[in-house]
Amino acid sequence: MSPLPRVNIDEPKYDQNSYLGRAKHFFLLTNPLNVLASASKLEEARQIVIKYRAGKDVPECKTIDDVWRAKYLYDSAFHPETGEKQIVIGRMAAQMPMNTIITGGMMAFYKSTPAVVFWQWFNQTFNAIVNYTNRSGTSPISQQQLVTSYCLATSGALVTALSLNHAVKNMNPLLGRLVPLVAVGAANCINIPCMRMQELRNGVTLFDEHSNEMGISKKAAVVGISTVILSRIAMAIPGMTLTPVLMNVLEKRGFLAKYPRSNAPIQTLFCGFVLIFATPLGCAFFKQRADIKVDSLESEVRDSIRKKRPELETVWFNKGL
């Protein structure tokens, strides 16, 4: 058998400069079936990645596609910087099944105050686990950051959901069904900046086209965090808007009155179907390696870059997920 071609498996398989390429990448990375992989399968994938990176033969793989499958399975379960195996519900592959349960619960029981409190708390607990599991290996999230973010986001989501439920109780029922989306959006606007406060305070590292460090910018941090918030909200919008529309139609036609126990199962299954597509498509909205014009940076950062590379017009940074 001829040796496998050598490719850089630490870069995504697909072109990240196009939306389609980013979408394909995240479809593989967030594949919920990866959650079902056994410990032995994950270890096999890890060994393939280690050997291929080291330039050794990988007899387990007949084609380069086999290597890529192992790499995406590896990426779905191991921390990209530390290499540690992540807890199952904190993995990217768990996003769709976990958010299906959470979104379905939020949408089905939005009228009950105890249920609103429970599901918003459950959602923020899940978010905290995801943030901790995917924390930076070089700039880890402190325990204080995690607790502060968790408490503020949970409080923000609860205040938003409960106050809006009270405000719309005499309005169109469809508006009431949209309250969970607004609460989730509000929580994201609190949670993500809190979790990444260090970046807002100190800035993120800027690179040129050859990955040479060019400076540190707080403005780039604001841009990166803002795009992450938009991506998170975009992931939630399809399931949390299409589901209310569907349920409103079923309610008007008397289906829910005839089959009242079908309410929660229908919403949960429909949310799951939507999230299969919404999760990777939302992640793909913005490039992971974001770019920003040098002219739009802080004056001192811009001047420093101009001294190093007068001709450089664009710099890049990691926006996070």
From Swiss-Prot:
GO terms for molecular function: L-serine transmembrane transporter activity; monoatomic ion transmembrane transporter activity; transmembrane transporter activity. It is a multi-pass membrane protein. It comes from Drosophila melanogaster (Fruit fly). One of its GO terms (biological process) is mitochondrial transmembrane transport. GO terms for cellular component: mitochondrial inner membrane; mitochondrion. NCBIfam families: mtc. Mitochondrial amino-acid transporter that mediates transport of serine into mitochondria. It comes from the Eukaryota. Belongs to the sideroflexin family. Its main location: mitochondrion. This is Sideroflexin-1-3. Keywords: Amino-acid transport, Membrane, Mitochondrion, Transmembrane, Transmembrane helix, Transport. The chain crosses the membrane at residues 101-121, 146-168, 174-194, 220-240, 266-286.
